[in-house]
């Protein structure tokens, strides 16, 4: 795949710097990072280039791997290996363990059963003191944080009934069952947030 065919994401271009600021705070030092749902691969290249001490492992469903590969091939970063196939619903988690997990704009695309499968599988790939950062829009006790998020949720559910903005408390309940403790909820531009968990067991 040539560089002309690289998949692009305008939202990644807009949010990559605010997200990087959060990651550099909560992923200090050398980290082996697993990105779940790497999408285009845009974030991976930007973050791996900015933080060479991180080993950034992309993952996604099989149909997205070629696009991710095109970004990684062009960037040729020594700390960003080939993407691996990961479909959380199928349970094909990698055998490796990671110090950190990152995922952006995935929970509202996944069905709720897939979100549950994600957190059920996380302990299998997390080191004992790992951190997890998930970026995206979230509700609070069923309430939308903005009119634009309510409109976005309606758009998502129009595309597929299983999609939709998730409630932070419901997601955190899954995280707690996976042995994770919420240590921060960082407001982000465009009515998004970064939720940060620490593995405690």
Predicted regions and their residues:
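A short, conserved alpha-helix within the catalytic core of class I
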Residues: 110-122
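Short alpha-helix
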Residues: 162-179
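Class I SAM-dependent methyltransferase Rossmann-like catalytic core
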Residues: 1-29
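A short acidic, Gly/Pro-enriched loop at the edge of an enzyme's catalytic core
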Residues: 93-101
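Conserved glycine-rich SAM-binding loop
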Residues: 39
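Class I SAM-dependent methyltransferase SAM/SAH-binding core
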Residues: 34, 42-91
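Core SAM-dependent methyltransferase catalytic element
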Residues: 180-201
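Conserved beta-strand signature within the Rossmann-like core of class I S-adenosyl-L-methionine
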Residues: 129-141
